[in-house]
Amino acid sequence: MLSTTQSTLLSEAAHRYAQAISEEALAYLDARGISEVTAARYSLGTIVDPIEGHQGYTGWISIPYFTALDICVGFKFRRLDDGKPKYGAPVGQKSHLYNVTATTYDSPKIVICEGEFDAIIMNETGIPAVGVPGVAAWKPFYPKLFTGFDVIYVIGDNDTREDKETNPGAEFARRVASEVVNSQIVQLPPGMDITDFYLANGKDELTNLVGGVR
């Protein structure tokens, strides 16, 4: 549990980073189907004047995590160049469910995605969605958050490739679905995540994967 001082520091940083979002970051997000308006809605930003623990990510895209009470509890970072690793997070930071507010929506369905940007894309189609940054970030108490939904769609990245013997996205989907009541796995085409599918096929085809918007 973060102290009030820590939460305030993180929330102020999230606001500052969002205000400083760069044209390069906006161009990257736009190419991934996330508009400037949507980026602002989720407080996506650019790391400038970093707080302690964020110094190694200056210039990266900031992805803040908020509670259902709109309190910032952590960050994920996405680099803009082709370097590795593509994503980062402060050392020692606890993992959280991204866009957890979606679990409070009055909806018959919700989608559990593998990643933050995928959750944003799905939410913007009108279907509530949360993001989990990989199977290792799934926690034993998460299933309780989805009680009350008629159906919970689980969509992992389809990491199938000829040069890979494992499929982490499929493992993620199986693990989550095995613990969440009323869940259904939706498998994407090989090599695709939700964002890839959206960019290739559009909003209607994406929402049709989970029964359409209703």
Regions found by a protein language model. Give the residues of each.
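Phosphate-handling DNA/RNA-contact segment within nucleic-acid enzymes
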Residues: 2, 6, 48-151, 165-168
